[in-house]
């Protein structure tokens, strides 16, 4: 990168560095009731079935999807 390019980029980003970044004021309360073991197991199982099972199916049948040459 040339010196001129770095000076131009520094000039463009220099003013953006001085702007104040607004902070979100997020406050939350503790949960009214804790999740039980059964709810956690159902959530993990549904995530597994939703994401990992189709990916595993595609990876295990990858040879079937290839074009014959």
Curated annotation (Swiss-Prot):
Stored PANTHER family: CYTOCHROME C OXIDASE POLYPEPTIDE VIII (PTHR16717), CYTOCHROME C OXIDASE SUBUNIT 8A, MITOCHONDRIAL (PTHR16717:SF1)
Segments on the Mitochondrial intermembrane side according to the record's topology features: 61-69
Interval spanned by the transit peptide: 1-25
Motif window: SIFI-degron: 2-19
Entry's localization field: Mitochondrion inner membrane
Biological processes, Gene Ontology terms: mitochondrial electron transport, cytochrome c to oxygen
Similarity comment: Belongs to the cytochrome c oxidase VIII family.
S-S pairs: none
Presence of the UniProt keyword Ubl conjugation in the record: yes
Quaternary structure, from the entry: Component of the cytochrome c oxidase (complex IV, CIV), a multisubunit enzyme composed of 14 subunits. The complex is composed of a catalytic core of 3 subunits MT-CO1, MT-CO2 and MT-CO3, encoded in the mitochondrial DNA, and 11 supernumerary subunits COX4I, COX5A, COX5B, COX6A, COX6B, COX6C, COX7A, COX7B, COX7C, COX8 and NDUFA4, which are encoded in the nuclear genome.
Transmembrane segments: 37-60
Membrane topology annotation: Single-pass membrane protein
The name this protein goes by in its record: Cytochrome c oxidase subunit 8A, mitochondrial
Principal subcellular localisation of the protein: mitochondrion
Chain ranges on the Mitochondrial matrix side, renumbered to this chain: 26-36
Entries under Pfam families matching the protein: COX8
Known pathway: Energy metabolism; oxidative phosphorylation
Keywords associated with the record: Membrane, Mitochondrion, Mitochondrion inner membrane, Transit peptide, Transmembrane, Transmembrane helix, Ubl conjugation
Role: Component of the cytochrome c oxidase, the last enzyme in the mitochondrial electron transport chain which drives oxidative phosphorylation. The respiratory chain contains 3 multisubunit complexes succinate dehydrogenase (complex II, CII), ubiquinol-cytochrome c oxidoreductase (cytochrome b-c1 complex, complex III, CIII) and cytochrome c oxidase (complex IV, CIV), that cooperate to transfer electrons derived from NADH and succinate to molecular oxygen, creating an electrochemical gradient over the inner membrane that drives transmembrane transport and the ATP synthase.
């Amino acid at each position: 990168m040339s010196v001129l390019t770095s000076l131009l980029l520094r000039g463009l980003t220099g003013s953006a560095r001085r702007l104040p970044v607004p902070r979100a004021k997020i406050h939350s309360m503790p949960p009214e009731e804790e999740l039980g073991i059964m709810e956690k197991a159902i959530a993990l199982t549904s995530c597994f079935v939703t994401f990992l099972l189709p990916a595993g199916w595609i990876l295990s049948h990858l040879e079937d999807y290839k074009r014959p040459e």
